[in-house]
């Protein structure tokens, strides 16, 4: 059995992974802090914010597939995905600052409009282009499955490391920058500049494979000719794509619920800085799990069993967090939070490699290369799951009687915070575990190859020739 060809050096993998520093200065800041910034600093209504975010999500499903298709049809000296990754983040930086720079002298309607425009452009246009392109690079810079897993692990180590720092220090950082609206604006500017620099370094650290290595002229013609409708059919007929998309949406919805921790720490635990403490107990175990994921995947000859069993651990962990939370036992909450995060880590590390396997499944069944649009599930999940999660948080807070101008919240609001932060994450983990138990795309690909009487190397050669 011939050894699988390698394409990347260690610094390529690290450089690629650093790109999620940029992605998470946007994502972590939005999901963890935008709602509490709008309600407690600007003084806007949580329910109205929730409705605006929900309306904004209408645009997202369309733009994900559009940008995925555009990436597949792009041919430049830089490659297919890198131009979109580079230029997309310029817009991300500008609109991120806009979201956290709402003028205090505007009336309420103008403030809501300002937020809606900046938020929609950030999510539906610029973050979409950047994130899909960044994710698609996994399939465009290497054909080695182990390297893809390693890229995913490096990526999410940087992602969770960035999330940890942002969640741990942002409240204090805002105060250090003067507090209030000016403090939030200054912090957003600093985060945006950091993201812009790191995103550029990441994009320039890897080189996309040539067209000759990816496909021959006949295949390239096929790729550029499929229509939007055909691309949509390819996706919806790939059951594994649909599973990953739903899973990713649920994960990001989960993240939005965990983001309620800003309110939970401030109004239930009476110490907003406890949000940063919980961030440590979430992100450090995630990073530890990511470090060991490539080794375990290699030892177990695949990703399916690891993903399924580790998420079972995560589900048990979140159940115990809920029990400890209602007991009021913070040390136990922290311990079980760490256990849940440890179980969630492997899927975060090998998810991009699973998506690449889904893309291979489409090629084996439909004979179409759709690498760019296949990775639309990542951006789609981030925006629909995270966005709608944030929207629902706002609506539920408003429904419960929460008001950002109050120092002490009513019992109904406190009860709602318990439900959102303790019960909902457990339920979401339970559903994700069930989906992962059905997501054995590696086995499906192997069975198709066996039926066709071709080897792994022949599949790669066929996809390249």
State the predicted function of each range.
Residues 2-464:
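Membrane-embedded alpha-helical bundles of multi-pass transporters/translocases
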């Amino acid at each position: 059995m011939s050894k699988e060809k390698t394409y990347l050096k260690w610094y390529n993998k690290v450089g690629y992974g650093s790109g999620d520093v940029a992605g998470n200065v946007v994502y972590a800041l939005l999901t963890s802090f935008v709602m509490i910034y709008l309600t407690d600093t600007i003084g806007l209504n949580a329910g109205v914010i929730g409705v605006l975010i929900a309306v904004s999500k209408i645009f997202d499903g369309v733009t994900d597939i559009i940008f995925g298709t555009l990436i597949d049809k792009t041919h430049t000296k830089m490659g297919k995905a890198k131009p979109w990754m580079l230029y997309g983040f310029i817009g991300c930086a500008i609109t991120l600052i806009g979201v956290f720079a709402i003028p205090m002298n505007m009336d309420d309607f103008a403030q809501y409009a300002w937020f809606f425009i900046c938020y929609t452009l950030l999510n539906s246009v610029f973050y979409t282009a950047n994130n899909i392109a960044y994710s698609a690079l996994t399939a465009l810079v290497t054909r080695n499955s182990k390297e893809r897993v390693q890229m995913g692990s490096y990526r999410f180590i940087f992602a969770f490391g960035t999330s940890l720092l942002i969640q741990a220090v942002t409240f204090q950082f805002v105060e250090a920058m003067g507090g209030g609206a000016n403090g939030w604006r200054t912090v957003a500017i600093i985060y945006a500049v950091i993201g812009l620099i790191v995103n550029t370094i990441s994009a320039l650290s890897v080189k996309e494979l040539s067209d000759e290595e990816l496909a021959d002229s006949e295949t390239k013609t096929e790729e550029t000719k499929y229509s939007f409708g055909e691309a949509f059919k390819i996706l919806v007929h790939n059951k594994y794509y649909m599973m990953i998309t739903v899973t990713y949406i649920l994960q990001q919805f989960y993240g939005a619920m965990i983001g309620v921790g800003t309110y939970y720490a401030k109004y239930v635990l009476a110490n907003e800085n406890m949000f940063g403490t919980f961030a440590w107990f979430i992100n450090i175990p995630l990073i530890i799990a990511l470090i060991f994921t490539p080794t375990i995947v290699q030892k177990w000859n695949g990703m399916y069993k690891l993903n399924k069993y580790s998420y079972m651990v995560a589900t048990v962990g979140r159940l115990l967090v809920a029990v400890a939370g209602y007991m009021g036992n913070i040390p136990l909450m922290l311990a079980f939070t760490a256990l849940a995060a440890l179980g969630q880590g492997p899927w975060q590390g090998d998810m991009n490699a699973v998506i690449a396997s889904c893309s291979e499944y489409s090629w084996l069944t439909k004979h179409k290369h759709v690498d760019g649009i296949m990775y639309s599930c990542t951006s789609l999940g981030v925006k629909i799951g995270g966005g709608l999660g944030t929207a629902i948080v706002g609506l539920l807070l408003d429904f419960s009687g929460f008001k950002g101008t109050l120092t002490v919240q009513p019992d109904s609001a406190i009860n709602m915070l318990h439900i959102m932060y303790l019960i909902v994450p457990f339920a979401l983990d339970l559903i994700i575990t069930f989906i992962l138990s059905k997501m054995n795309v590696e086995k499906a690909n192997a069975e198709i190859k066996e039926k066709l009487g071709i080897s792994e190397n022949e599949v790669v050669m066929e996809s390249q020739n």
